[in-house]
């Protein structure tokens, strides 16, 4: 193998160099502190699990995204997590088992077999928060507000919301009496907004004209708040009233607490349909087609772990947030400390580090590049006193 090929990383797999890594670590700390201030406890699930545990209660999409390997100790199949959300649901249902509301947050690397979108990463750093044990719009709103505040504290601005409710499609499917295979086929057609294909498929399955019209209407029920009023008329008598009421309540509360955040509604958008059960949302910024944060309600996932409970949450890619963020926070540069055995040198270095300063030793017989070391000051002994002098004032750098 040529030595140059040893430098290559797999396609879609990236690494962070010092500046980017420091920015990401700063963002990580800010987010964990934010989640803590809202009452969310940090959990750290394992990177790999037995495959049946990792994929329980999720759809085939996640299974296709999961790298699989054989455990050399047991011979059982294991998977490298592609999504931390199911792991946190397992922890909440099996390990913690609180009687009231449980709030958990997490951050960690995930691995995807394929990148999501052109030029996308296959090794995101997923960060998110989950709330268990409450099914009302209050918890939907809390999670939504926390997601938007998380974007704000890492410098992602000009966010607008896209809201939907997968319960509308699910309720219509039940009335149409479709099989799981037919439901999946209809789901794929709906994502393409192909009205004629929807009509043809449902006619072939003897679905009545009124219900066919409702399914086709989902392709065009998108826009501002007026869409919800239109949906009440178009979908009247279909049993989706509760879902529309939830959307209206969340929209009203969002207007109250986040009046400057634009909202868009799309009743045909079924993001995360395989495990979401109710309200779903995504956050977008101008000039970017992919969501920077997404979440929603997934009340059924705890049942497969032996404890059914309401659940809602969100997730985002920390590496992407750092790239997109416009935070003005700057890194304080360090102090260069040429190696010395003079009295008080080590004591002064220790004191500076305890104060939070970055102090970098300069070794004898080496050339020091202050920019590479990240230093703009130097520790100097003058008049038997250790002083901090700006490097530019010393005529260096």
Curated annotation (Swiss-Prot):
PANTHER family the UniProt entry points to: HISTIDINE--TRNA LIGASE, MITOCHONDRIAL-RELATED, HISTIDYL-TRNA SYNTHETASE
Assembly: Heteromultimer composed of HisG and HisZ subunits.
Name of the protein this chain belongs to: ATP phosphoribosyltransferase regulatory subunit
SUPFAM superfamilies: Class II aaRS and biotin synthetases (SSF55681)
Organism classification: Bacteria, Pseudomonadati, Pseudomonadota, Gammaproteobacteria, Chromatiales
Function: Required for the first step of histidine biosynthesis. May allow the feedback regulation of ATP phosphoribosyltransferase activity by histidine.
Keyword tags: Amino-acid biosynthesis, Cytoplasm, Histidine biosynthesis
Annotated InterPro entries: aa-tRNA-synth_II/BPL/LPL, HisRS-like_core, HisRS/HisZ, HisZ
Known pathway: Amino-acid biosynthesis; L-histidine biosynthesis; L-histidine from 5-phospho-alpha-D-ribose 1-diphosphate: step 1/9
């Amino acid at each position: 193998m040529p030595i140059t090929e040893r430098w290559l990383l797999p396609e879609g797999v990236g690494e962070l160099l010092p500046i980017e890594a420091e920015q990401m670590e700063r963002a990580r700390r800010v987010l964990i502190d934010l989640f803590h201030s809202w009452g969310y406890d940090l959990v750290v699930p394992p990177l790999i699990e037995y495959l049946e545990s990792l994929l329980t209660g999720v759809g085939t999409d996640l299974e296709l995204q999961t790298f699989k390997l054989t455990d050399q100790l047991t011979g059982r199949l294991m998977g490298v997590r592609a999504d931390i959300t199911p792991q946190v649901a397992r922890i909440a249902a099996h390990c913690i088992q609180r009687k009231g509301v449980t709030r958990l947050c997490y951050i960690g690397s995930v691995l995807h077999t394929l990148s999501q979108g052109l030029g996308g990463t296959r090794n995101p750093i997923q960060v998110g928060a989950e709330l268990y044990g409450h099914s009302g719009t209050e918890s939907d709103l809390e999670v939504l507000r926390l997601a938007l505040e998380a974007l704000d504290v890492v410098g992602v601005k000009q966010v607008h919301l896209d809201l939907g409710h997968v319960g509308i499609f699910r309720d219509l499917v039940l009335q149409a009496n479709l099989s799981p295979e037919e439901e999946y086929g209809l789901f794929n057609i709906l994502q393409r907004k192909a009205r004629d294909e929807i009509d043809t498929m449902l006619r072939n399955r003897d679905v009545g004209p009124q219900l066919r019209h409702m399914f086709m209407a989902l392709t065009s029920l998108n826009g501002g708040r007026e869409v919800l009023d239109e949906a009440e008329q178009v979908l009247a008598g279909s049993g989706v009233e509760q879902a529309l009421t939830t959307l209206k309540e969340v929209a009203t509360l969002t207007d109250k607490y986040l009046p400057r955040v634009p909202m868009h509604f799309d009743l045909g958008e079924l993001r995360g349909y395989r495990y979401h059960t109710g309200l779903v949302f995504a956050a977008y910024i101008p000039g970017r087609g992919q969501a920077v944060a997404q979440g929603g309600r997934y009340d059924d996932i705890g049942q497969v772990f032996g404890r059914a409970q309401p659940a809602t949450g969100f997730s985002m890619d920390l590496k992407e947030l750092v790239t997109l963020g416009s935070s003005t926070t700057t890194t304080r540069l360090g102090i260069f400390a040429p190696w010395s055995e003079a009295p008080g040198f080590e004591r002064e270095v220790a004191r500076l580090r305890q104060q939070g300063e970055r102090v970098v030793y300069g070794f004898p017989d080496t050339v020091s590049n202050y920019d590479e070391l990240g230093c703009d000051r130097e520790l100097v002994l003058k008049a038997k006193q250790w002083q901090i002098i700006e490097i530019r004032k010393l005529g260096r750098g």
